[in-house]
Amino acid sequence: MSGSSTPKSLPTSGQQSLHDIKHPLSCSPSAEDDAAGENGAVIIESPSPDLPNTEPSSLADKDLSLPNGTPADTSSPASSSSLLNRLQLDDDLDGETRDLFVTVDDPKKHVCTMETYITYRVSTKTTRTEFDLPEYSIRRRYQDFDWLRNKLEETQPTHFIPPLPEKFVVKGVVDRFSEEFVETRRKALDKFLKRIADHPVLSFNEHFNVFLTAKDLNSHKKQGITLLSKMGESVRYVTSGYKLRNRPVEFATITDYLDTFQLKLGTIDRIAQRIIKEEVEYLMELREYGPVYSTWSGLERELNEPLEGVSACVGNCSTALEELTEDMSEDFLPVIREYMLYSESMKTVLKKRDQVQAEYEAKAEAAALKREERSTVPTDVEKCQDKVECFNADLKADMDRWQNNKRQDFRQLLMGMADKNIQYYEKCLTAWESIIPLLQDKQEPK
């Protein structure tokens, strides 16, 4: 590449009825979750933010048991880690049936005369006959991922396309070349490709094949807009002023649910950011607080060991808090924001479905006025009806798939959050317990 320096390496890092749609944070279990509980799977449930807190005030007042009736072991906080391992094992078993594996890793920084950007290695392993080789390894930058998503939207308008992480960041607030930002984006891009690779339709898209295998995408990017996309634009133009008369209730229900779901996640995102800000401020105070005891110990010969112990204890607590804050910033918030973007993308597809139905209704009404002149239904009306039915079938299947993925993602997210908090309080408890012998030891004055 002309005018560029050597790349700098960065650290690598079942089907469900649409009427049974449930908020991921709802306290009421679904039938599917009940079935999972009977088979021994552990289900983590969280009360809805809208409901008052009716939980028992103490552990003694609460019946601690697992969904399958097995009493919970409260004496071993580390049991949450075993639950996380069980969820990971379920993912490994699902992976045995897949035939396409995609991974995004190894980000590298490229400094050119005109711009500076990050590329990521995209590795593919597959047994599909559509691919010439069983393994591929190419490098892609963010705009390549954006090109892929746009092509999927053009060629697969009846399906939910997974979201990409937001492209623009506020300059001066977020350093888009920092290791933390690059790693967070890498995880999001990896999740984006994995969702496409697991989709029974999107994974066979020709543009996805090109993205995974082509060494250079420039020749493919120069191709003009597809005919299907132009047809979609004409539909929007023709039906922009038409109001639907017979919109299916199930799709109206999905739209209402997505609005509420997105609102709840937005609230969680804002509150979580405030919590992180307060934790960072508290962390800064702790870092100043601990050394004071260490300095003081130099003046108190008789209290030297206890004061040094308190200083070390505060230091250990600040380290544990830093780890908890980093986990919330790098693991918790990205999932919340991904599903906020996912909801917005899904609502866009639902609007396209309404536009196709509006086109069908408009043509059907026009054909009805001429029914006396014709004995058969016009071909274009039948084609529009087929489009609507295709849209409906694809959206129902994608909605079921999205609900299953969402339930699994939020289960892992909440389980991970619980596990990290347990680890934090365990470390703080251990730190404070370690200095009790020093405080109880009565030293004789010399």
From Swiss-Prot:
Composition skew (Low complexity), residue ranges: 70-84
GO BP terms: positive regulation of autophagosome assembly; protein transport
A Pfam family it matches: BAR
SUPFAM superfamilies in UniProt: BAR/IMD domain-like (SSF103657), PX domain (SSF64268)
Region annotated Disordered, chain positions: 1-84
All copies of domain BAR, residue ranges: 243-446
Record key words, sorted: Endosome, Membrane, Protein transport, Transport
Residue spans of biased composition, Polar residues class: 1-18
Domain PX: 98-219
GO MF annotations in UniProt: phosphatidylinositol binding
Annotated GO CC locations: early endosome; early endosome membrane
Topology term for the membrane: Peripheral membrane protein
Subcellular locations according to the entry: Early endosome membrane
Oxidoreductase listed as a keyword: no
Major subcellular site: membrane
Binding site for a 1,2-diacyl-sn-glycero-3-phospho-(1D-myo-inositol-3-phosphate): R141, Q143, K171, R185
Chain's role: Involved in the regulation of endocytosis and in several stages of intracellular trafficking. Together with snx4, involved in autophagosome assembly.
Family label: Belongs to the sorting nexin family.
Name listed for the protein in its UniProt record: Sorting nexin-30
Gene (name only): snx30
